[in-house]
Amino acid sequence: MVEIEYGKVRIKLGDTAHVYEPAEDSFLLADAALKEAKPGMRILEVGAGSGFVSAVLLANLKDIHLLATEINPHAARCAKANGVEVIRTDLFRGIKPEKPENRFDLILFNPPYLPTSKEEKVPGWLNYAFDGGISGRETLERFLDEARAYLKPGGKILVLISSITGLEAVKEIMKSLGFKADVVERKKVSFEELIVVRGKLL
């Protein structure tokens, strides 16, 4: 059993052959989320994977109401084992936005952002953690199209992207959907720069 200790919490990863192991992108999103989240907030993490980011928030903030979604059944079990309430579903599909409890102050997403051709797909469930489609933005664009319906007035999203994903393209998409987009964190890692973009409803 692999474990990672970070931000006052020890995360159990279980079978890392099927679950994305938290790395620099996970750490950067967790750090950004800790700065953005406040006590009393309703928070949703989409595609929570092992539950790393959610578990860090739960360990460091009091009185938050946190829900997560995850499509990979192995990762969903891992997130539950780390104390995260998780619904196994694709993005927002298992959540009904018309219910008041399903409107959130803050939504987090670390999407698969690697441009991926059919030949580059990873076998099995782990592909969901890496495969961003040909543009690297396919899953992110689906998320952005739906996110607004799940936010409270003035709500915010935090998304982790790579310089490979195309920062300006992402900001333009967010702007077209009624978000004010700002970069709140960035970190150079080997061949890419990791970037956390905040979108605030206008």
Describe each region flagged by the PLM.
Residues 1-202:
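Auxiliary N-terminal substrate/complex-recognition segments of SAM-dependent methyltransferases
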